[in-house]
UniProtKB/Swiss-Prot annotation:
It is found in: Cytoplasm. Disulfide bonds: none annotated. The keyword Nucleotide-binding does not apply. GO terms for cellular component: cytoplasm. This is Flagellar assembly factor FliW. It comes from Clostridium botulinum (strain 657 / Type Ba4).
Protein backbone atom coordinates (compact mmCIF):
# COMPACT_ATOMS: atom_id res chain seq x y z
CA UNK A 1 0.00 0.00 0.00
CA UNK A 2 1.07 3.58 -0.50
CA UNK A 3 0.61 6.67 1.63
CA UNK A 4 1.17 10.06 -0.01
CA UNK A 5 2.28 12.27 2.86
CA UNK A 6 2.36 16.04 2.90
CA UNK A 7 6.00 16.37 4.03
CA UNK A 8 7.63 12.98 3.49
CA UNK A 9 6.54 12.05 -0.02
CA UNK A 10 5.18 8.65 -0.91
CA UNK A 11 5.63 5.93 1.72
CA UNK A 12 5.18 2.23 1.00
CA UNK A 13 3.72 0.15 3.84
CA UNK A 14 1.97 -3.13 4.43
CA UNK A 15 -1.12 -3.95 6.49
CA UNK A 16 1.09 -5.55 9.15
CA UNK A 17 2.79 -2.15 9.67
CA UNK A 18 -0.45 -0.49 10.79
CA UNK A 19 -0.83 0.24 14.51
CA UNK A 20 -4.39 0.60 15.81
CA UNK A 21 -5.27 3.25 18.41
CA UNK A 22 -8.80 2.52 19.65
CA UNK A 23 -9.26 6.02 21.14
CA UNK A 24 -7.07 7.82 18.60
CA UNK A 25 -4.60 10.21 20.21
CA UNK A 26 -5.36 13.49 22.03
CA UNK A 27 -6.35 16.09 19.45
CA UNK A 28 -6.94 13.44 16.78
CA UNK A 29 -9.44 11.13 18.46
CA UNK A 30 -11.09 10.34 15.10
CA UNK A 31 -7.87 8.85 13.68
CA UNK A 32 -7.17 5.25 14.67
CA UNK A 33 -4.63 3.84 12.22
CA UNK A 34 -0.98 4.90 12.17
CA UNK A 35 2.34 3.76 10.79
CA UNK A 36 5.85 4.62 11.92
CA UNK A 37 8.73 5.24 9.56
CA UNK A 38 12.19 6.81 9.88
CA UNK A 39 12.96 10.40 9.02
CA UNK A 40 15.29 10.34 6.04
CA UNK A 41 18.99 10.74 6.96
CA UNK A 42 18.20 10.89 10.69
CA UNK A 43 18.74 8.22 13.32
CA UNK A 44 17.01 10.02 16.20
CA UNK A 45 13.59 10.93 14.80
CA UNK A 46 10.74 8.83 13.44
CA UNK A 47 7.45 9.85 11.86
CA UNK A 48 4.23 8.69 13.50
CA UNK A 49 1.76 9.10 10.63
CA UNK A 50 -1.98 8.62 10.20
CA UNK A 51 -2.97 6.48 7.23
CA UNK A 52 -6.47 7.96 7.43
CA UNK A 53 -5.36 11.58 6.94
CA UNK A 54 -2.34 12.20 4.70
CA UNK A 55 -1.73 15.59 6.36
CA UNK A 56 -1.30 14.25 9.91
CA UNK A 57 2.22 13.15 10.74
CA UNK A 58 4.01 13.75 14.02
CA UNK A 59 7.74 13.63 14.65
CA UNK A 60 8.56 11.27 17.54
CA UNK A 61 11.65 9.94 19.26
CA UNK A 62 12.55 7.41 21.90
CA UNK A 63 12.57 8.98 25.37
CA UNK A 64 15.78 7.06 26.07
CA UNK A 65 17.54 9.32 23.54
CA UNK A 66 16.74 12.21 25.89
CA UNK A 67 16.60 10.71 29.40
CA UNK A 68 18.49 7.45 29.87
CA UNK A 69 16.57 6.75 33.09
CA UNK A 70 13.12 7.51 31.66
CA UNK A 71 10.59 5.37 33.44
CA UNK A 72 6.82 5.17 33.41
CA UNK A 73 4.43 3.07 35.42
CA UNK A 74 1.42 1.87 33.45
CA UNK A 75 -1.87 1.38 35.25
CA UNK A 76 -3.46 -2.06 35.17
CA UNK A 77 -6.19 -0.79 32.82
CA UNK A 78 -3.56 0.50 30.36
CA UNK A 79 -1.70 -2.82 30.45
CA UNK A 80 -4.99 -4.62 29.76
CA UNK A 81 -6.00 -2.23 26.96
CA UNK A 82 -2.61 -2.68 25.31
CA UNK A 83 -2.65 -6.47 25.87
CA UNK A 84 0.90 -6.24 27.19
CA UNK A 85 2.24 -9.55 28.48
CA UNK A 86 5.90 -8.54 28.60
CA UNK A 87 7.51 -5.10 28.88
CA UNK A 88 9.88 -5.91 26.02
CA UNK A 89 6.82 -5.87 23.72
CA UNK A 90 6.28 -2.18 24.55
CA UNK A 91 7.68 0.53 22.30
CA UNK A 92 7.70 3.96 23.97
CA UNK A 93 7.81 7.10 21.83
CA UNK A 94 7.40 10.78 22.62
CA UNK A 95 6.24 13.62 20.42
CA UNK A 96 8.70 16.29 19.32
CA UNK A 97 7.86 19.95 18.75
CA UNK A 98 10.16 21.30 16.06
CA UNK A 99 11.39 24.87 15.78
CA UNK A 100 13.70 26.63 13.35
CA UNK A 101 15.76 27.55 16.42
CA UNK A 102 17.40 24.27 17.43
CA UNK A 103 17.51 25.36 21.09
CA UNK A 104 13.70 25.58 21.14
CA UNK A 105 13.02 21.99 19.99
CA UNK A 106 11.18 20.16 22.76
CA UNK A 107 10.02 16.65 23.57
CA UNK A 108 6.80 15.85 25.44
CA UNK A 109 8.02 13.40 28.08
CA UNK A 110 4.75 13.61 30.03
CA UNK A 111 2.52 12.05 27.34
CA UNK A 112 4.27 9.01 25.87
CA UNK A 113 2.85 6.93 23.05
CA UNK A 114 2.92 3.28 24.14
CA UNK A 115 2.75 0.62 21.42
CA UNK A 116 2.42 -3.13 21.83
CA UNK A 117 4.67 -4.13 18.93
CA UNK A 118 3.39 -7.72 18.99
CA UNK A 119 -0.32 -6.88 18.86
CA UNK A 120 0.08 -3.65 16.83
CA UNK A 121 -2.08 -1.61 19.19
CA UNK A 122 -1.23 1.64 20.94
CA UNK A 123 -2.35 4.37 23.27
CA UNK A 124 -1.04 7.78 24.21
CA UNK A 125 -1.08 8.16 27.97
CA UNK A 126 -0.73 11.17 30.24
CA UNK A 127 1.61 10.78 33.21
CA UNK A 128 0.11 12.42 36.31
CA UNK A 129 3.42 13.53 37.75
CA UNK A 130 5.68 16.55 37.63
CA UNK A 131 8.70 14.28 37.12
CA UNK A 132 8.62 14.89 33.35
CA UNK A 133 7.86 18.04 31.37
CA UNK A 134 5.52 18.58 28.43
CA UNK A 135 8.21 20.78 26.84
CA UNK A 136 11.49 19.12 27.74
CA UNK A 137 14.40 20.66 25.77
CA UNK A 138 15.81 18.22 23.23
CA UNK A 139 19.27 19.72 23.58
CA UNK A 140 20.52 20.71 27.01
CA UNK A 141 22.97 23.56 27.33
CA UNK A 142 26.48 22.50 28.27
CA UNK A 143 27.45 23.77 31.71
Amino acid sequence: MKLNTKYHGSIEYEERDVIYFEKGIPGFEELNKFIIFPVEDNEVFLVFHSIENEDIGIIVTSPFNIEKDYEIQLEEEQITNLKLQDEKDALVLNTVTLDSDIDKITVNLRAPIIINIKEKIGEQIIINSDKYKVKHPLFKEEA
